[in-house]
Design a protein with these regions (language model features):
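Catalytic-core helical/loop segments in enzymes performing group transfer/polymerization on anionic/lipid-linked
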Residues: 1-272
Length: 272
């Protein structure tokens, strides 16, 4: 489906269904549903064969994540507890310089602006290849081991049925994806809260690409602890980017899964 058509359909769906039925521990998790729809509707691989292959790969990936989460729970790095600012990014934004060192094009320029005036720690939400030498020190934040048996109530199932009628996306696939994303969100929420709760001086968290379960979990943990979150956009965002534009039912107090503020690339991105 074309990006513009997917965007318009997501806006229609959000306007038509009850988005308040998706709650976990007091958190409205509709942003997870939106992200699922965005991926499903814009994906070119939608046949059954691809879906089955993807499901098998996801099972192995989930098992690997659980094993790694257990391992890292016993081998946590020592984290400074007097940070005033924390930056959280992704290795995909690393670019090689002439010096052969790697520079994070999203967060490193901001870190340089703050200089020595702030106590800062930078995290990545996945491992950085050993061969890459970075300009600035960093730590890797790992999701916690958390096994949750997730069930859907009748109201949630009803909304998924409505979404299927409007979008033709498989009802079972929607439910499977939601449980998968919610588990990931929970693991990152638990991990982030454990780290952030020890940061008594922390005022702000700068993060990239907020619209995945890892960053949503981090945002929710920060929200619960009263820590401000800022999404630093990784590029210009068009008017059909459904994770930034076209939100119709944002709660009065906002979504805890979303950042408090957005740093946009220019006025057009702000307008969108």
């Amino acid at each position: 489906m074309k990006t513009s058509d997917a965007f318009k359909l997501i806006v229609q769906i959000e306007s038509s269904v009850d988005t308040d039925v998706f709650i976990w521990k007091g958190f409205n998790t509709w942003p997870l549903i939106r992200q699922i729809l965005w991926v499903e509707l814009t994906s070119t691989a939608s046949n059954d064969k691809t879906s089955k292959k993807g499901s098998t790969l996801e099972i192995f990936a989930s098992i690997k994540k659980i094993v790694l989460a257990i391992y890292y729970s016993f081998s946590e790095a020592k984290i400074s507890q007097d940070n005033t600012k924390i930056f959280i990014s992704r290795p995909v934004y690393l670019q090689e310089l002439h010096s052969k060192k790697y520079f994070d094009r999203i967060v490193d320029p901001i870190i340089e602006l703050f200089g020595l005036n702030e106590k800062i720690t930078k995290f990545y939400v996945s491992n950085v290849p050993n061969k890459k030498e970075l300009m600035y020190e960093f730590l890797v934040m790992h999701q916690s081991f958390s096994f949750n048996i997730l069930t859907l109530d009748s109201e949630q199932k009803k909304v998924f049925q409505q979404i299927t009628r409007l979008s033709s996306v498989s009802n079972l696939e929607l439910q499977r994806r939601y449980k998968q994303k919610l588990r990931s969100f929970i693991r990152w929420f638990v991990a982030a809260k454990k780290i952030l709760s020890k940061q008594k001086k922390l005022k702000e968290i700068y993060l990239t690409s907020w619209y995945f379960p890892d960053m949503m979990g981090i945002c929710a943990a920060a929200s619960e602890l009263g820590i401000k979150t800022i999404d630093v956009q990784h590029g210009k965002q068009g008017k059909y980017q459904a994770m930034y534009c076209g939100w119709k039912k944002i709660p009065e107090s906002g979504y805890a899964l979303m950042p408090d503020n957005f740093w946009c690339w220019g006025q057009p991105s702000c307008d969108h």
